[in-house]
């Protein structure tokens, strides 16, 4: 019995020691968490895809043309305007080689509008004449011009120096005009040219020329000043308007400018007179002569293409 009790005590001691050891071990090594396997999600049933219809391509209609803003000059239809334009551009591009084109266009224009046919039947030969057969008088007007107030000597301006003083070429034109004014003492003198001195806005070519002429003995009452123009076409349009308004007695014009510039000057002043005749029924005046400053053979910048621009700007105010 005594032995049995001893054995029991030993067993209990061993059991208690084992439990204490396990508890101590649990504190040293934390338990590894057990991760339960997650079941995959159940598949979500999807509806069958809706079929997409094939795209239908509708052809794009052509754009609606913009309304035309074309308005021919007064007295012209679109057809007559195009005939005149064709003649002007043909001569500028080809000169004498355009003769057949000009003849055909004039025939059509005469059938379409006889008055316009007559007008351009005068302008187109004039253009050819000033480039091929114009007689240019050196330094002074010839004899035989009107000796009364019906003659006007038109002096074309030239670019001023920035300060408003005369360039040498403009002085030469004034000297030519002075000789002509002394030869024809009853003639009116029209000085034409606007402000071209960028450092002196008060100076104009016409004003400077008029001052020079009066300083050299020309009576100021003989001088008509046109001081608004910027181009030779402006010279022709503005001076002609002043002459018709203030000096209807003038019937003959004599142009004074540089030799190389004379064909353009004669062409534009005579064209303006012919256009006035077309509009009013009366020819106000004609270019009858000229006197040129000799520039020593300076080559003219007034090519037929340049002439076309000026001539067309007078014939078509929208140009």
Protein language model features and the residues they cover:
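N-terminal Sec-pathway targeting helices
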Residues: 1-13
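Extended hydrophobic/Leu-rich segments
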Residues: 7-9, 19, 35, 57, ...
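Hydrophobic alpha-helical membrane-insertion segments, chiefly the h-region
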Residues: 12-23
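A structural signal for short, hydrophobic/glycine-enriched beta-strand patches
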Residues: 23-26, 33, 65-314
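Ser/Thr-rich, Proline-interspersed low-complexity disordered segments
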Residues: 27-68
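The feature marks non-catalytic terminal segments
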Residues: 318-319
């Amino acid at each position: 019995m005594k032995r049995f009790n001893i054995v029991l005590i030993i067993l209990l001691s061993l059991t208690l020691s084992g439990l204490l050891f396990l508890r101590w071990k649990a504190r040293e090594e934390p338990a590894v968490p057990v991760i339960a396997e997650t079941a995959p999600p159940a598949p979500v049933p999807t509806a069958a895809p809706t079929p997409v219809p094939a795209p239908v391509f509708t052809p794009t209609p052509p754009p609606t043309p913009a309304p035309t803003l074309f308005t021919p000059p007064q007295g012209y239809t679109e057809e007559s305007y195009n005939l005149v334009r064709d003649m002007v551009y043909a001569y500028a591009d080809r000169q004498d080689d355009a003769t057949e084109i000009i003849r055909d266009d004039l025939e059509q224009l005469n059938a379409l509008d006889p008055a316009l046919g007559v007008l351009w039947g005068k302008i187109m030969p004039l253009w050819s004449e000033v480039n091929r057969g114009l007689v240019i008088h050196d330094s002074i007007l010839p004899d035989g011009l009107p000796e009364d107030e019906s003659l006007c000597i038109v002096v074309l301006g030239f670019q001023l120096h920035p300060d408003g003083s005369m360039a040498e070429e403009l002085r030469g034109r004034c000297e030519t005009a002075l000789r002509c004014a002394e030869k024809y003492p009853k003639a009116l003198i029209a000085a034409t040219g606007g402000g071209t001195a960028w450092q002196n806005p008060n100076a104009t070519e016409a004003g400077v020329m008029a001052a020079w002429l009066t300083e050299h003995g020309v009576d100021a009452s003989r001088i008509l000043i046109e001081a608004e123009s910027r181009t030779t076409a402006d010279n022709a349009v503005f001076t002609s308007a002043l002459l018709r308004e203030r000096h209807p007695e003038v019937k003959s014009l004599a142009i004074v400018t540089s030799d190389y510039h004379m064909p353009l000057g004669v062409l534009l002043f005579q064209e303006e007179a012919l256009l006035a005749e077309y509009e009013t029924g009366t020819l106000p005046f004609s270019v009858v002569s000229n006197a040129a400053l000799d520039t020593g053979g300076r080559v003219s910048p007034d090519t037929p293409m340049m002439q076309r621009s000026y001539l067309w700007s007078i014939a078509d105010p929208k140009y």
